[in-house]
Amino acid sequence: MTFSQTGLRQATVVHKVIHIVVLRNNHRPLIHFFREAGGTPLSVSATVPRMDTSPPLLGDADLPGPICLNRLHSLGVVCKLDNDNAYSYHDSRTLYGRASIISTLMPSRSVACAGTAAWVWLGGMFPNTIDIISKAHYRTARYGRKVSVFNRQAPDEHVTDVGPITVTTPTRTACDLAMNCTPETQSPVTEIVCMLMQEFRFRPDDCLQVMQEATHIR
């Protein structure tokens, strides 16, 4: 066997091991990760739970070393939140998965709103801040993200429970984003609001109704 063949085989084995490490305690189906990376699934037991109850974030304790996190990020398997923590792109594919990820980052007894709520509803690039409705103030960053607190009134009709979190409805989320955008953020905010309206089928009249019900939305 030549050196190049040996190196290729070692690289393939390492590539597969990295993917297996991500599946802590075999809670997630292996086939999804191997298909993402274009690999061939290993022969494993099919008796895996339907619901993944493992924590949605990966940390140092879940991986052999810090190099693994960077490697997984470069492979497109995980999204890094900071130098020590990340979440799986596989988990972020569903509404419940995104809510579970956000629940780990959000302070207790708070409501996800604005950009954070938009990510829960739509997915996409993870927001730079954790936007919440709360009466408390948080000065410490969480997983590399600043906690942005909005001390607003949120009627029961404007929030809903998604898995483990409470989040503003798509209509209220669009209003929060539109009423608080700046000239610098107007273009991306407009795109997000249009996506929310298209995905969840609400109209400008619905937004006007929300604004009438919450006079302190700004």
Question: Could you tell me what each predicted segment is?
Answer:
Residues T2-G7, I18-H19, L23-I217:
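Short gly/ser-rich loop at a beta-strand->alpha-helix junction or flexible surface loop bordering the NTP-binding
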